[in-house]
Amino acid sequence: MMSLESLWLWTFAISFIVLIAYLIGTWNHDFFSKRNIPSLKTVPFLGNMGPLVLRKASFAEHSQNIYNRLKGYKYGGMFEFMNPVLVLRDPELIKMVTVKDFEYFLDHRAPISEEAEPMFGKNLFNLRGHRWKEMRSTLSPAFTSSKMKNMFVLVSECGKQLGEFLMECSRDKNKKTEGCKIEREGDLLTVELKDLYTRYTNDVIATSAFGIGCDSLKNPKNEFFQMGKDVTNFGGIRQFIFLGYLFSPRLMKYLNLKFLSSKATEFFRFLVHNTMDTRKTKGIIRPDMIHLLMQAKEGTLKSEENGETNGKIASKPKWDDDDLTAQAVLFFFAGFDTASTLLCFMSHLLATNPDVQNRLQDEIDQSLEENDGKLTYEAIHSMKYLDMVVSESLRLYPPAIFTDRKCVKNYRLPMEPSYTLEPGDAVWIPIYAIHHDPKYYPNPEKFDPERFSDENKDNIKPFTYLPFGSGPRNCIGNRFALMESKIALVHLLCRFNLKVVSKTPIPIKITKKGFNMTVDGGFWLGLEERTNQ
């Protein structure tokens, strides 16, 4: 039996350990209060990340809750675990940080280091300072209007394959769908769109960036598609690994926990290196990303500033093979997931708003009729209502729920309360929450493409619409993502009406199981073949 003295010692020891743990878990949580900055109440160790860790809220809901709790302030403080983060709510302040005073906020935060995860740490999003500027300049020529026009034919062919595949499935009830999530509900073809659209975007990236033909609609077991699903899976254990890097990058590096699977990493290494070697040996020149990376490696790529080639030859960069492969992985990730997610939400919004769908189909029909049934680069960019629908879809469901910046030199905020950010301080811009703020968008949950009409779009306050970020650090591939999304939608809507079915999630609820903008149970819709086509 334990003596009274032993019991007292154990009680003291446990109390002491709890006290030390509490002090460690809250040691910096007075960071904002000491600076007279409004901030949120915190929990030891978790800071303000508890709802995400415990899966009580989706990432979108979590960011919106933080934004709303700081209502009335131009900025305020929160904690990512034990790390202080300044949340910006004021559009003018966002403009200063992302554009006007960009030199003070040059970098993104990069919790996953190059040493811990080369394919993640070395990509354009995570590169810093001069290395980021050099890589951004290198990759920019891949996304000019002329390059988009050259790739349009390749992307449109993938869109055509998508439309024809669905027509075959609709007309042939016995057609094998090779693992596609396709069912029937009465006379309707019911489809899980996330699976369908990721097959499409996979093929788009494969052909336009790597020069590879996959046809994932008929052959979903191809390795390119399987690795794409692996790289873009932010659920399960990978979600907690990422949160672990936010909590303590050093600990995660010590534990050697990888964010990307070794299989996916080696696949992309081999793909990029092998493609480069083959092209170099056989003298193959193709206007795609691989060719640009080859030029960058050899130091023969013309640098580009502000979207125009300046004619100067860039000095040969000191990049290794992993530097180049990391950009290919980023391009694949952005094109694979961003466009497919946008297409899912856009299709859902059209199915649940048939008046908008009908008007968009009228515009598509008229454009195709004027161009002898052909979809051209010029035609798709002349469809104003299509652009309005896409813009409003991106407002409601932006691909990035938030973006961030890291201060690189002292910066005094020009607003009260006065505060000077120091190098290393983190800044958070809650895109999703701003897009859903009734102050900027009346009735923000309503799908209303008219917000972006020629008559109304000037009413949108600058720096409150940020679907692809803002300033020099915005998404480099946004024009490509928009183009591949519009092409798929046109090929679909010229053949089918989108219908709500029993499996369609109404209302949409963003999943709490990961960082991806997706829904539990999938994006199920019905496809009804148009009788007038």
Curated annotation (Swiss-Prot):
Signal peptide: none
Protein name in UniProt: Cytochrome P450 9e2
Record keywords: Endoplasmic reticulum, Heme, Iron, Membrane, Metal-binding, Microsome, Monooxygenase, Oxidoreductase
EC number from the UniProt entry: 1.14.-.-
Intracellular or extracellular location(s): Endoplasmic reticulum membrane; Microsome membrane
Family named by the database record: Belongs to the cytochrome P450 family.
Organism in which the protein naturally occurs: Blattella germanica (German cockroach)
Any one GO cellular component localisation term in the record: endoplasmic reticulum membrane
InterPro entries, sorted: Cyt_P450 (IPR001128), Cyt_P450_CS (IPR017972), Cyt_P450_E_grp-I (IPR002401), Cyt_P450_sf (IPR036396), Insect_CytP450_Detox (IPR050476)
Induction: Expressed at all life stages.
Top EC group: oxidoreductase
Gene Ontology molecular function, alphabetical: heme binding; iron ion binding; monooxygenase activity; oxidoreductase activity, acting on paired donors, with incorporation or reduction of molecular oxygen
Binding site for heme: C475
Cofactor(s) of this protein: heme
Gene3D superfamilies: Cytochrome P450
UniProt-listed Pfam families: p450
Bilayer disposition of the protein: Peripheral membrane protein
CDD domains reported for this sequence: CYP6-like
